[in-house]
């Protein structure tokens, strides 16, 4: 298992194909649904609660697919994509720690949107701090996070929950 503390886009794509942490590890989405270009920091004992943290980035440019369809004449990154990126990162964290299975978002306590990502922005930064890790029959991560655009916080989310399942057929 890789215990690197940063990952580039190629690494994240490899994770989406089951090639980074192993074929049974949780996978990131691929292609347009991968909302992360790099992870600049990941550790198992940092963050506000001392249980781990992740800092990741997405480069923004006017040609990104969602600006072409959300909305015509008023392009803005859908808030749900930023929220999904935060869940992606919780699942990635669990795979990085060695969990095996399929990742599924299980919920979020509270989400606040106080800004937007427009085509002229340069960079989105995601900052997560892990609150709880459960390694029993159900593997689950719970984290709080913020999303910034060009250094300004625009989203916050509490209690992001991701579970890792050996079998999702009855989920």
Swiss-Prot record:
Coiled coil: none annotated. It comes from the Bacteria. GO terms for biological process: unsaturated fatty acid biosynthetic process. Pathway: Lipid metabolism; fatty acid biosynthesis. It catalyses: a (3R)-hydroxyacyl-[ACP] = a (2E)-enoyl-[ACP] + H2O; (3R)-hydroxydecanoyl-[ACP] = (2E)-decenoyl-[ACP] + H2O; (2E)-decenoyl-[ACP] = (3Z)-decenoyl-[ACP]. One of its GO terms (cellular component) is cytoplasm. Belongs to the thioester dehydratase family. FabA subfamily. PANTHER family: 3-HYDROXYACYL-[ACYL-CARRIER-PROTEIN] DEHYDRATASE, 3-HYDROXYDECANOYL-[ACYL-CARRIER-PROTEIN] DEHYDRATASE. This is 3-hydroxydecanoyl-[acyl-carrier-protein] dehydratase. The gene is fabA.
């Amino acid at each position: 298992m890789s215990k690197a503390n940063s990952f580039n886009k190629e690494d994240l794509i490899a994770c989406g194909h089951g090639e980074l942490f192993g074929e049974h590890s949780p996978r990131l989405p691929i292609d347009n649904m991968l909302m992360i270009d790099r992870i600049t920091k990941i550790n198992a004992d940092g963050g506000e609660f001392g249980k781990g943290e992740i800092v990741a980035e997405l480069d923004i440019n006017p040609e990104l697919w969602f600006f072409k369809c959300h909305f015509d004449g008023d392009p803005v990154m859908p808030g749900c994509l930023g929220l999904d990126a935060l869940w992606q990162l919780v699942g990635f964290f669990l795979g990085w720690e060695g969990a095996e299975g399929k990742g599924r978002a299980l919920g979020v306590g509270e989400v606040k949107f106080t800004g937007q990502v427009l085509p002229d922005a340069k960079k989105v930064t995601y900052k997560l701090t892990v609150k709880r890790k459960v390694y029993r029959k159900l593997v689950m991560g719970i984290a709080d996070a913020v999303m910034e655009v060009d250094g300004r916080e625009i989203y916050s989310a509490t209690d992001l929950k991701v579970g890792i399942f050996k079998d999702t057929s009855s989920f």
